[in-house]
Amino acid sequence: MTDRLRATYRVKATAASIEARAKGIAVEQSVEMPLSAIDDPAVLDGIVGVVEEITERGEDCFEVRLALSTATIGGDAGQLFNMLFGNTSLQDDTVLLDIDLPDDLLASFGGPNIGAAGLRARVGASADRALTCSALKPQGLPPDRLADLARRMALGGLDFIKDDHGMADQAYAPFASRVGAVAAAVDEVNRQTGGQTRYLPSLSGHLDQLRSQVRTGLDHGIDTFLIAPMIVGPSTFHAVVREFPGAAFFAHPTLAGPSRIAPPAHFGKLFRLLGADAVIFPNSGGRFGYSRDTCQAVAEAALGPWGGLHASLPVPAGGMSLARVPEMIATYGPDVIVLIGGNLLEARDRLTEETAAFVASVAGAASRGCGLAP
């Protein structure tokens, strides 16, 4: 039998039908045809998925663990997604719950370029404090207005300032003009204050456009970027990460909702595997419906030991406010990037002061958090 990865699914089925359902998933995620039509022993033994375990988790609810051949992956990130959950994602009774990959497969994809420790080093942050981030909004502002927002945020002492994930190469703020203006504003503040604030442009487009955008950023002294893996595609995301080993990448979760991959596996493992140095996800109690347990599981998957890969920093976000900072630090400890966007921008003329209050609140609360990193 060839090397195998393990994939665990949550399946809605009756006790009478679950065994057949599990075997059906094993076939669908491997050879996708009747086994009776296969006459090659190597395919039957080495490629066909194997049902290893079925565990009942409630009425008409089961966990199914499959062993799938790593040979079917071919070293490609998109094909990894395909063989883990491609056709089965079309079955609305099934969720991809977890993955367990052999060390050689982990090493072949490589994970983050610099990881959690590298991000801390970039902004001069010690290991005992959480990091801070905000976003440039709204869509529609011209480059000079976005640069002014970034300047005032940087004066407040933020670690990271990212583009809103919807910013691309629109006519009202073309990528090159926006990045040049914002990078210059942040760099000027850093030189004045001795700070190390990083600006993260949002990357978009096809592979050649992404390459060009990263190079544009590098030309402006930028070394950290925002990217949406499910928009550009897993293979493209992975290719960009590997092509620019000195760059760091925050992965945005947009469009990940329809995938029905459990968030800890999706953001904490798959995004980390393909190269996310930080993973943004919807925090509990915000605009989205994730539970506190789910959010903690995402953070644990992003930070935990995994075959020698760098840890990814969790970035809980989505409608957060300054009032929630103590709670977030108590939940995640210092091993987190706290992202607050619109709530800061509501300060308008007091943006710098409100940003400074955010930074001070995170610094003051971090020492009281429990932390999730091993």
Curated annotation (Swiss-Prot):
Its biological purpose: Catalyzes the conversion of 5-methylthio-D-ribulose 1-phosphate (MTRu-1P) to a 3:1 mixture of 1-methylthioxylulose 5-phosphate (MTXu-5P) and 1-methylthioribulose 5-phosphate (MTRu-5P). Involved in the MTA-isoprenoid shunt of the methionine salvage pathway.
Organism, as annotated: Rhodospirillum rubrum (strain ATCC 11170 / ATH 1.1.1 / DSM 467 / LMG 4362 / NCIMB 8255 / S1)
Family annotation (InterPro entries): RuBisCO, RuBisCO_lsu_C, RuBisCO_lsu_C_sf, RuBisCO_lsu_N_sf
One GO-annotated biological process of the protein: carbon fixation
Transmembrane segments: none
This enzyme's EC code(s): 5.3.3.23
Catalysed reactions listed for this entry: 5-(methylsulfanyl)-D-ribulose 1-phosphate = S-methyl-1-thio-D-xylulose 5-phosphate; 5-(methylsulfanyl)-D-ribulose 1-phosphate = 1-(methylsulfanyl)ribulose 5-phosphate
Sequence similarity: Belongs to the RuBisCO large chain family. Type IV subfamily.
Protein name: 5-methylthioribulose-1-phosphate isomerase
Enzyme class: isomerase
Gene that specifies this protein: rlp
Organism lineage: Bacteria, Pseudomonadati, Pseudomonadota, Alphaproteobacteria, Rhodospirillales
GO molecular function: isomerase activity; magnesium ion binding; ribulose-bisphosphate carboxylase activity
Pathway participation: Amino-acid biosynthesis; L-methionine biosynthesis via salvage pathway; Metabolic intermediate biosynthesis; 1-deoxy-D-xylulose 5-phosphate biosynthesis
Keywords: Amino-acid biosynthesis, Isomerase, Methionine biosynthesis
Pfam families for this protein: RuBisCO_large
Superkingdom per UniProt: Bacteria
Phenotypic effect of disruption: Disruption of the gene abolishes the ability to utilize 5'-methylthioadenosine (MTA) as a sole sulfur source. Mutant cannot release methanethiol upon MTA feeding and accumulates MTRu-1P. Inactivation of the gene increases ethylene production from MTA-grown cells.
Isomerase listed as a keyword: yes
